[in-house]
A protein has these predicted regions:
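Conserved N-terminal phosphate-binding loop of PLP-dependent enzymes in the Aspartate aminotransferase
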Residues: 1-233
């Protein structure tokens, strides 16, 4: 990303970061704040509206000025239009302000990151212990589950980036059949797991994580006994 910033500065090209997911999650300043990179424009959503409908675009003052209204009819006819269903929605704005005050504290991200690392490590330990092909990986407070695949750095620990794995596997994850079966098995254990992974938050506790890992183990053992890992799906 640093090299991309250098390239765009040399060519006079705008650098746009999509921080809809990473914004305020990787750090209070998103990925750009964590890495010390300042893009020209940034898209944000989800957290920025406190969980209510809404999104935001931020960027350099000279670029953002192209959106503003002025006391100039000719300018207002030429300005970049910015229509939106939730523009100036007071409810989303109030929720967003309250939420942003919370996530401005780096302790929020540190806690969510720690819970995600605990979950990834626990799930990988289950996979290694029972000899089930698969790995759980992710950065920050995100986790991805890839059953039916192997990576060379699976040692039952937290995996930030799996090694020896095709980029296609990282993109698509496990097969739809395995994903659906795992989801159903986890629901039977009392855990509503998002298909293929999920995201942790400041609300999750170590007890939540440990109970999820225990449910994951029971679900996988049942799937193994039913023959789900006897062949590549």
């Amino acid at each position: 990303l640093h090299r991309l910033r250098e390239l765009t500065e040399r060519t006079g090209t705008l650098l746009i970061f999509d921080e809809v997911i990473t914004g305020f999650r990787w750090s209070p300043g998103g990925v750009q704040g964590l890495l010390g990179i300042r893009p020209d424009l940034t898209t944000m959503a989800k957290i920025v509206a406190g969980g209510l409908p809404g999104g935001a675009v931020g960027g350099r003052a000279d670029i953002m000025a192209l959106l503003e209204f002025r006391d100039d009819p000719e300018w207002n006819r030429r300005r970049v239009a910015h229509p939106g269903t939730f523009n100036a929605n007071p409810l989303s704005a109030a929720a967003g302000c309250a939420c942003l005050q919370l996530v401005a504290d780096p302790a929020v991200q540190r806690h969510a990151d720690a819970m995600a690392a605990r979950l990834r490590r626990g799930m990988n330990q289950v996979l290694v212990t029972h000899g089930i092909p698969g790995f759980v990986w992710g950065e920050s407070s995100v986790f991805h589950i890839a059953l039916g695949h192997t990576c060379t750095n699976q040692r039952g620990e937290d995996i930030r980036m799996p090694e020896g794995v095709s980029p296609i596997v990282l993109k698509t994850g496990m097969s739809p059949a395995l994903a659906t079966t795992l989801y159903q098995a986890m629901v039977n254990e009392g855990v509503d797991l998002f298909h293929g992974g999920g995201l942790l938050s400041v609300a999750h506790t170590p007890d939540d994580i440990d109970r999820t890992v225990e449910a994951f183990e029971r679900a996988l053992v049942r799937m193994r006994d039913e023959g789900w890992f006897d062949q590549t799906l």
